[in-house]
Amino acid sequence: PGALWGLAFTLPLLAIAVLDFVQKRHSLRRNYPLVARFRWLFEDLRPYLRSYIVESNQDGRPFDKNARALVYARSKNQTSTHPFGTELDVYSDEYEWLSHSVAPNESVPAEFRLAIGGPQCTRPYSAAIPNISAMSFGSLGGKAIAALNLGAKRGKFYHDTGEGSFSKYHALYDGDIVWELGSGYFGCRDAQGHFDEDAFRKTATLDQIKMIEIKLSQGAKPGHGGVLPGAKVTPEIAETRGIPVGEDCVSPAAHSAFSTPLELLAWAARLRELSGG
């Protein structure tokens, strides 16, 4: 009886081995009869073996075992805390932390501001950390400009005019202004588009103008510069920028007031002199 049971077990395996050897579809089964079939078995078992035997609690993407366990626990209203430290290597390069100091600095003042202006500056400015970045009148409408300036007034931070110059809407609420000068010199240009010192002085000496910003180039519009189509040049925009109504408004690719770094520094010094700062 024992031999019969042995044959009952081995004969099917032998038949499978012979079938593998004579078939011509899979070279692996032909070269390794019967044994090659374990390859596909382990391929099917691979995800389970990796998940339950090989994979650690920190392996797995996008969510590792710990993250999944946390979700499972919370979905069942169970505790998701893990006592006695952590399994993570918090000393590796991917982790950062703040260390306690035995000699801490003084507490930060309630209103933290940054002083702008060196010893040569006669009109230094105390700036907030968050401010309103450059957005021109023309790209934004008058109501938007006025609303932004009112926010600057209430929040005690500055409002950058953008390259489109200082408009009457910037002046409505007397919020602090940073006047940006680009290559088009809008608001302080002559008929040929060059820098006009008298026009600059008239605006720059206003109490509302706190700083002058020089825009060196056209950034996302290099080469040909920026263009505001004539259809968008309304009488208000033309008056603000000092350009003809209904004609294309061109911001050149480079400045005409300077062409070298030293000339830029000399021009910046001249702007300081003209603005009284």
Give the positions of each predicted feature.
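Gly-rich Lys/Arg/Thr-decorated short loops/hinges at beta-loop-alpha junctions or inter-strand turns
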Residues: S126-N131, A238-A253, E273-G276
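Hydrophobic, Leu/Ile/Phe/Ala-enriched alpha-helical segments that form helix-helix packing faces
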Residues: A152, A268-S275
